């Protein structure tokens, strides 16, 4: 459509017989579609539809034969339809949509768990797989350029097994083979420009992984990536985050290229170097902490390109615990994502008396929060494991004492178990919550605020450091209210891991008592809902409440105590009638559109690279995609 009208949408309005308002509604949809790389929100996993009628969309499509053909092909997938379950990503057996389980509407949650657990027992990692149900069993589709990699190149020599119930499990290579082949080719070309041996090894292992489907090769690429310290241009690619798989273990493809912001990185560097003195301030003893804090790379980046369904504000990867515990990890704060603002952005739920402080300090408060979340949040803690039969990474004769019970621990990770396999679909949100709570606890340390340029390191709620701390707590409380947008009353499930976590932290603030935090309103419909948070009580009421919650989150994770963790987390993230019937409705009325990011393109001309930027508008978003090459 864009090519047909050459970007002149007022002309296409006349051609299609539509008003400019109707065309603008289509453009809003198109920009959101491109920003989320699909018609389900990347942050919320619910379907969004155009605000124009199907007949109006068809009128737009009739302007050319090509657009009409595409419309006829996809028209049934664009709008809501009668099947409400299809409005959400989730398990197919619950009536939801998931492309991780293609052509398998009858595959059950138990079958997915059974196949996944079986493959885990064989040592096959799941991130680059999908599962398809067949008459006699299951096909496990492995993303790879080759449809028949040699047994030596595969992670498992065998590729077919029979389960106890007689059903067959077969590995089928070559999923997304065209895309994986193109990606591997470009990775091999990029290797020619590697700056050092770590980058060369990284490219070689990427290529092996994308050609053969080997995630062991991908893990080697991530080890090399971690060891490549402080590059000027930072990049990583692969099946990394598992938020969108309803089972919580299969990855979504993403890749990014970004440049280092040296000034901001310096502040994060100070945080890295002083991290070992702050970890002991968290509410557990050394038994539940890594033997040695592996000092990670902590970099503030300006994103050039982030290819994926959504762009985070910070990243802490790789997610493989053995690499994290033995080689470390990288923390990345994405500065130009943190500070990006849409024109005339509204800030609901903040009192007028707090607004000036909030607007002035929300960016620095968020930067401190992201730094602590990524570095110390995801970076701290130890999983207590039986690493191989009879071998433990803790003193088994005198087991650690749980601060929750005052007794020796009774659970730990068994051989072959990982954090992800034990906690499953709970893992993503639970770990985000743990990291957020670490950040909320340690943002109360005034020497940390001084590292970022606020205050003199002494505890003082009345100076600029106090402003940043107060804003950080307000920001989290506000995020907890806004989170209700991402909870679905029909399925009674949370559509977004971070938002479920933030709601639980708001509940933790409120549980600390009205002396600390309270939701206030005068109107019956809560249209004037605001947060009252007592600045002077953060240190003596707010932080202890966070510490108590964080201690449970951490100890349950460290000891593989899934049952207690799930019971606690389900309870605190349960949306009670007051929140469902009143607060959520107020949130939806004040809902602000989710940001989509218009990204620049790079074009090579005669050996030189030209940067093309676009305006922050729907048209700019579409134009940027029109001028981009695709796999």
Residue ranges of each PLM-predicted region?
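Short active-site segment of divalent metal-dependent hydrolases/proteases
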Residues: 372, 376-377
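Alpha-helical packing segments of well-folded alpha/beta enzyme cores
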Residues: 183-187, 371, 438
């Amino acid at each position: 459509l864009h090519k047909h009208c050459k970007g002149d949408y007022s002309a296409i309005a006349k051609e299609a017989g539509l008003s400019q308002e109707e065309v603008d509604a289509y453009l809003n949809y198109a920009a959101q579609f491109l920003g989320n790389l699909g018609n389900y929100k990347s942050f919320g996993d619910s379907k969004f539809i155009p605000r124009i009628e199907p007949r109006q969309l068809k009128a737009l499509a009739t302007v050319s034969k090509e657009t009409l053909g595409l419309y006829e092909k996809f028209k049934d997938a664009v709008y809501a339809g009668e099947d409400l379950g299809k409005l959400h990503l989730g398990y197919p057996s619950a009536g939801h949509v998931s492309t991780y389980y293609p052509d398998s509407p009858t595959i059950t949650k138990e079958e997915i768990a059974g196949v996944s657990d079986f493959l885990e027992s064989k040592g096959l990692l799941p991130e680059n797989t999908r599962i398809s149900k067949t008459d006699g069993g299951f096909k496990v589709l492995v993303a790879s350029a080759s449809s028949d990699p040699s047994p030596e190149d595969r992670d498992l020599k065998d590729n077919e097994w029979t389960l106890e119930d007689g059903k067959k499990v077969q590995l089928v290579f070559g999923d997304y083979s065209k895309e994986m082949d193109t990606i591997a080719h470009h990775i091999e070309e990029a290797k020619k420009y590697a700056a050092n041996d770590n980058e060369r090894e990284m490219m070689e292992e990427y290529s092996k992984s994308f050609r053969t489907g080997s995630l062991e090769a991908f893990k080697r690429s991530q080890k090399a990536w971690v060891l490549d310290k402080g590059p000027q241009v930072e990049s990583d690619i692969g099946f990394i985050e598992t938020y969108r798989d309803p089972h919580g273990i299969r990855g979504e493809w993403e890749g990014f290229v970004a440049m280092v912001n040296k000034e901001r990185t310096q502040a994060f560097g100070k945080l890295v170097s002083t991290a070992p003195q702050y970890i002991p301030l968290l509410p557990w003893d050394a038994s539940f902490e890594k033997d040695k804090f592996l000092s990670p790379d902590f970099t503030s980046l300006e994103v050039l390109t982030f290819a994926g369904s959504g762009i985070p504000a910070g990243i802490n990867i790789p997610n493989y615990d053995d690499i994290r515990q033995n080689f470390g990890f990288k923390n990345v704060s994405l500065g130009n994502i943190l500070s990006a603002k849409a024109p005339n952005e509204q800030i609901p739920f903040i009192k007028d008396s707090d607004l000036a402080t909030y607007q002035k300090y929300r960016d620095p408060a968020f930067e401190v929060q992201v730094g602590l979340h990524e570095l110390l949040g995801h970076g701290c803690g130890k999983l207590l494991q039986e690493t191989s039969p009879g071998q433990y990474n803790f003193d088994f004769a005198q087991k650690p004492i749980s601060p929750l019970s005052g007794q020796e621990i009774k659970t730990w990770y068994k051989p072959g178990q990982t954090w992800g396999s034990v906690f499953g679909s709970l893992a993503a949100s639970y770990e985000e919550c743990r990291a957020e709570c670490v950040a909320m606890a340690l943002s109360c340390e005034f020497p940390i605020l001084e590292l970022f340029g606020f205050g003199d390191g002494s505890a003082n709620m009345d100076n600029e450091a106090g402003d940043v701390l107060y804003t950080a707590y307000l920001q989290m409380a506000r995020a907890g209210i806004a989170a209700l947008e991402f909870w679905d009353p029909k399925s009674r499930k949370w559509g977004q891991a971070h938002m479920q976590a933030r709601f639980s932290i708001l509940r933790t603030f409120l549980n600390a008592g009205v002396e600390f935090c309270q939701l206030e309103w005068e109107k019956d419909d809560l249209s004037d809902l605001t947060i009252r948070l007592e600045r002077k009580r953060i240190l003596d009421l707010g932080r202890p409440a966070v510490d108590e919650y964080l201690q449970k989150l951490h100890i349950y994770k460290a000891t593989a105590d899934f049952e207690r963790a799930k019971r606690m987390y389900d309870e605190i993230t349960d949306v009670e009638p007051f929140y469902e019937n009143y607060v959520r409705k107020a949130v939806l009325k004040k809902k602000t559109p989710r940001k989509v990011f218009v990204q620049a393109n790079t074009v090579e001309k005669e050996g030189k690279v030209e940067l093309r930027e676009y305006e922050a508008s729907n048209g700019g978003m579409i134009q940027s995609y029109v001028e981009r090459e695709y796999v």
